[in-house]
């Protein structure tokens, strides 16, 4: 149920009125963190489309105690977490471990283990059987923060829709719960 809304005027409209432009991600971050202040003891989950799949935005929400679930590109740069730093090591600490295969490669890999799941209320069409695979990783891009995520890869055994990938900033969250949150949004 909507309880907080905000208008996000275009850059041109802000320029015409002599106001500073705030992007959708700026306003979304402010709103989510305001909701966190209003509801400090609650599990707060923000579900958004791929426009909200930005590392700075996701890192700000994660640090603010808000879980985010968004779509993820199939070619996103996912890594293992950084290994522990050995005593006596010089130089800056590593941010990530080894690069993981892309999700598009995992999708076509015959060794990928898929789990069949029934999702109730699939976009208003009733129960839908899908196949998912999931793991935790860190998402990183040069110069941006490292964000620990749980990714979920979804495919339809009946080929009614293209495979899609989701991310959740709570790596411990159950993959089925991540899919259900997206569908119920």
Q: Language-model segments: what does each one mean?
A:
Residues 2-185:
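Single, function-defining residue in the core of a domain
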């Amino acid at each position: 149920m909507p309880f907080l809304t905000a208008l996000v005027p275009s850059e041109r409209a802000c320029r015409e009125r002599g106001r500073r432009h705030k992007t959708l991600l700026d306003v979304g971050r402010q709103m989510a963190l305001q909701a966190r202040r209003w509801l400090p003891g609650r599990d707060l989950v923000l579900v958004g489309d791929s426009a909200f799949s930005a590392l700075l935005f996701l890192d700000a929400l994660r640090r603010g105690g808000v879980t985010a679930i968004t779509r993820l590109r199939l070619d996103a740069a996912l890594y293992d977490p950084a290994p522990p730093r050995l005593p006596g090591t010089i130089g800056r600490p590593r941010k990530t471990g080894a690069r993981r295969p892309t999700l598009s490669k995992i999708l076509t890999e015959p060794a990928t283990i898929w789990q069949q799941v029934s999702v109730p209320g699939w976009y208003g069409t009733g129960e839908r059987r899908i196949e998912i695979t999931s793991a935790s990783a860190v998402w990183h891009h040069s110069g941006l923060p490292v964000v620990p995520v749980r990714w979920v890869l979804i495919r339809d055994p009946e080929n009614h829709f293209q495979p899609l990938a989701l991310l959740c900033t709570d790596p411990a969250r159950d993959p089925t719960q991540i899919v259900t949150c997206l569908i119920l949004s």
